[in-house]
Amino acid sequence: MNNNIINLIAAIILSLSIIFGWQYFVVKPEQKKQQQQIAVQKAENLKKQQLKALVEPATDIVVQEESGVQRIKIESESLTGSISLKGLRFDDLILKKYKQDLSNNSPEVRLFSPANTENAYFAEIGLVSNLSSVKLPNNDTIWNSDSEILSPEKPVNLFWVNEDGVKFLVTITVDENYLFTIEQTIVNNSDKELPIQSYGLINRKYTAVEKAVNILHQGPIGCIDENLKEYSYDDIKDKKSEKFAASKVDWIGITDKYWLSSLIPDKSSNYSSNFNYALKQGTERYQVDFISPVQIIKPGENFSIKSRIFAGAKKVDLLDKYEKQYDIKLFDRAIDFGWFYIITKPVFYAMNFFYGYVGNFGVSILIVTVIIKLLMFTLANKSYRSMKKMKNLQPEIDRIKNLYSDDKARLNQEIMALYKKEKVNPVAGCLPILVQIPLFFSIYKVLYVTIEMRQVPFYGWIKDLSAPDPTTIFNLFGLLPFSPPSFLMIGAWPILMAITMFLQQKMSPEPADPMQAQVMKFMPLIFLFMFSSFPVGLLIYWSWNNILSIIQQYYINKFN
């Protein structure tokens, strides 16, 4: 085999080894649950066109009713929680359909928490003015409500009147999923003009306890001027603030691996928006916010503006639905499908499609793998034939090398002439590898970032396709009463992957270069340890893909 081809294949293998070795040995695949505390915010001291980023924390907001302050209970198929009538803040939200782990007594996932709790995190929609004389609702305002429960069937109407007779009305609705709609109306019954600005903010206390996972974005995110803006927590911490003046803001928010909190402002105007960080009283606070231009409301006039808050699980079909229904640009990109988005999302659609028929994502992975294999059959067939031809030409290539060992230019010329004469493409054997690399990463991404794959079982001992195989050969798959260290957690599926990889190599033509042949023999063992911590769904794909390749190679050997 030509040295250039050997180098190319070796480079591909080395690149994969470096990428996944780094992931395994340096970057842990999951961030631990982060401890969060957050600040309560005030919005009265805003300058024109700019929302104050971070404010001092309050100490009087808890989930329970206090000092006579009631809460509006949120109750839907997907959500439970409450909204405080003091300050009208979304600071108590639980996702009913998701558990924190697979244990029987696992609590449900909590997204929002009040400001004086350990995991504080909340959203807020309100009004501000650049004139201090204008009396607006603030964090101490006690709103009046016509209902104690907010549900998809029953919106909540709130009102508050200031000392000048100006009436502030808020209507809150929630759908069956995770979208709140907040319509604010100002009725100017005073004899003065009111300069009003609408704002929204999401504030979170976040302290990283582990190094971030580089293959996944977590932190401030948004679509501004139809461009996706992503900033890690470290980015914002270093910059302190990232500002966007007078921009088209489709949505901004804070994303986790599976969960998203997002502000979706009214599309009637442009907005100034900010991604901010501050360290106050020993706590790290992150905030995303937007503020509208000044709207002058004349005496006797009304003004209404509608904003939305998404707070929930990043389900692909749900984000797609909202994106189309409300024209929210790039809303599906809150799911980090990565560089191969154009491949990864169709792969997910295919898996989800077959899941609708078979009811098991593991089986769906098997079906999609078969389809991919069929689509690539012709290419793989040509590749295998080319590899066999290259092996048959190796004696002649060795003769040419000996003949022109002192003349590299002539050597390459003669070898290329031989390829042309025998109609051999020297890179054909590499094409399936190059094509499968983005497919491999796409399937990995689907398993790693989509909520649909979280805590879903296969068969037998596999209860979560997005987690590593929980068994290990070092305690005889649970027969021995001890737990090996994590680097020895080599389960049945990693072993099956390595065995099928070894068998596939045995059926393939060996590399002509003895050194490369020796290296290839160790690859199944290297990959066994390297991939043991990867999602078991990926190992199911790889093992099944190897089995199909073995069948394909048997077919080619027999009939060609």
From Swiss-Prot:
<comment type="similarity">
    <text>Belongs to the OXA1/ALB3/YidC family. Type 1 subfamily.</text>
</comment>
<dbReference type="InterPro" id="IPR047196">
    <property type="entry name" value="YidC_ALB_C"/>
</dbReference>
<dbReference type="InterPro" id="IPR038221">
    <property type="entry name" value="YidC_periplasmic_sf"/>
</dbReference>
<protein>
    <recommendedName>
        <fullName>Membrane protein insertase YidC</fullName>
    </recommendedName>
</protein>
<keyword id="KW-0653">Protein transport</keyword>
<dbReference type="InterPro" id="IPR001708">
    <property type="entry name" value="YidC/ALB3/OXA1/COX18"/>
</dbReference>
<feature type="transmembrane region" description="Helical">
    <location>
        <begin position="334"/>
        <end position="354"/>
    </location>
</feature>
<keyword id="KW-0143">Chaperone</keyword>
<dbReference type="GO" id="GO:0051205">
    <property type="term" value="P:protein insertion into membrane"/>
</dbReference>
<feature type="transmembrane region" description="Helical">
    <location>
        <begin position="431"/>
        <end position="451"/>
    </location>
</feature>
<dbReference type="InterPro" id="IPR019998">
    <property type="entry name" value="Membr_insert_YidC"/>
</dbReference>
<feature type="transmembrane region" description="Helical">
    <location>
        <begin position="357"/>
        <end position="377"/>
    </location>
</feature>
<comment type="subunit">
    <text>Interacts with the Sec translocase complex via SecD. Specifically interacts with transmembrane segments of nascent integral membrane proteins during membrane integration.</text>
</comment>
<keyword id="KW-0997">Cell inner membrane</keyword>
<feature type="transmembrane region" description="Helical">
    <location>
        <begin position="522"/>
        <end position="542"/>
    </location>
</feature>
<dbReference type="InterPro" id="IPR028053">
    <property type="entry name" value="Membr_insert_YidC_N"/>
</dbReference>
<keyword id="KW-0813">Transport</keyword>
<dbReference type="InterPro" id="IPR028055">
    <property type="entry name" value="YidC/Oxa/ALB_C"/>
</dbReference>
<keyword id="KW-1133">Transmembrane helix</keyword>
<dbReference type="Pfam" id="PF14849">
    <property type="entry name" value="YidC_periplas"/>
</dbReference>
<keyword id="KW-0472">Membrane</keyword>
<dbReference type="GO" id="GO:0005886">
    <property type="term" value="C:plasma membrane"/>
</dbReference>
<feature type="transmembrane region" description="Helical">
    <location>
        <begin position="5"/>
        <end position="25"/>
    </location>
</feature>
<keyword id="KW-0812">Transmembrane</keyword>
<feature type="transmembrane region" description="Helical">
    <location>
        <begin position="476"/>
        <end position="496"/>
    </location>
</feature>
<dbReference type="Pfam" id="PF02096">
    <property type="entry name" value="60KD_IMP"/>
</dbReference>
<keyword id="KW-1003">Cell membrane</keyword>
<dbReference type="GO" id="GO:0032977">
    <property type="term" value="F:membrane insertase activity"/>
</dbReference>
<comment type="function">
    <text>Required for the insertion and/or proper folding and/or complex formation of integral membrane proteins into the membrane. Involved in integration of membrane proteins that insert both dependently and independently of the Sec translocase complex, as well as at least some lipoproteins. Aids folding of multispanning membrane proteins.</text>
</comment>
<dbReference type="GO" id="GO:0015031">
    <property type="term" value="P:protein transport"/>
</dbReference>
